[in-house]
C-alpha cells in the first residue's frame, strides 16, 4: 500500500482531530445497497479505473494528470460521463493529454450514479469501443459525472475506484461518510493549496478520512503544486502491476 502523502506538517494517522473534540459517525458502510452486477472477470481485457466524486472536486483535472503521467508508459484511454454535454471529454481533447480517438464521451441523461452503477451498459459499450479501436489497451479510466458522497462504481464496470473530494467543500466532508468516502479503493483529498483560503483544517480532514476508512489509503494533493499527481499515479501503477481486481 502506498504510504499516505501530505503537503502539511501534520500526522495522518491517529484518531484525534487536534481541535479538542470528536464527531459522532453514524454511517455504516455495510448498509450500502448491494452492487447489481458484481465483479467483472478480467480475462485479457484492459484494467478499468473509476474516478468519482462531487461536482467540482477535480475529477477531470486528475484524469488529465494521470494521462500526462502514464500516457508514455501505459496504453490507455478514457471514458467521460456528463448528463447532457460532452464537456469533460472536450476539455481532455483540448488539453491534448491523449489522442482524441482515445477519449469517448457518455451522455447519461440522468443522475450520474445511474450510469456507473445501476445501468452500466453505455459505459461498457464505450469501453468496448475503445478496446476494439486500440488493441492491447492496458488501462481505461472511467470518469463519472459529478455526484454526491453515495456515488460508487459497480464492480462490473470498474476494477478499482478512486473517490475525489476537495477542501473547498469544507473539512467536514470526510466525516459525513457515504460509500464514496468510506469504501473507494483510494480517497483523494484535492486542492489542499486552498485550505487556508477556505478555512479548512487539514489535520481534521485527514484524521476524519482515516477514521472513516480504516486501512484504506488516503492521499492529499494539489494539482497546482504537482500537476502530474505523482502519488496517485504511483498508486495506479501499483494496481496495474498487481493486476488488482478488488473484491474478486
UniProtKB/Swiss-Prot annotation:
Name of this chain's protein: Urease accessory protein UreG 1
SUPFAM superfamilies, A to Z: P-loop containing nucleoside triphosphate hydrolases
Q: Listed GO molecular functions? A: GTP binding; GTPase activity; nickel cation binding
Q: According to the UniProt record, where is the region Disordered? A: 1-36
Q: Where are the transmembrane segments?
A: none
Q: Which GO terms describe its cellular component?
A: cytoplasm
One short Pfam name that applies is: cobW
The disulfide bonds in this chain are: none
Q: Its family?
A: Belongs to the SIMIBI class G3E GTPase family. UreG subfamily.
Q: What does this protein do?
A: Facilitates the functional incorporation of the urease nickel metallocenter. This process requires GTP hydrolysis, probably effectuated by UreG.
* Gene Ontology annotations of biological process type: urea catabolic process
Q: Which UniProt keywords apply?
A: Chaperone, Cytoplasm, GTP-binding, Nickel insertion, Nucleotide-binding
User: According to the entry, what is the taxonomic lineage of the organism?
Assistant: Bacteria, Bacillati, Actinomycetota, Actinomycetes, Pseudonocardiales
What does the annotation say about its assembly with partners? Homodimer. UreD, UreF and UreG form a complex that acts as a GTP-hydrolysis-dependent molecular chaperone, activating the urease apoprotein by helping to assemble the nickel containing metallocenter of UreC. The UreE protein probably delivers the nickel.
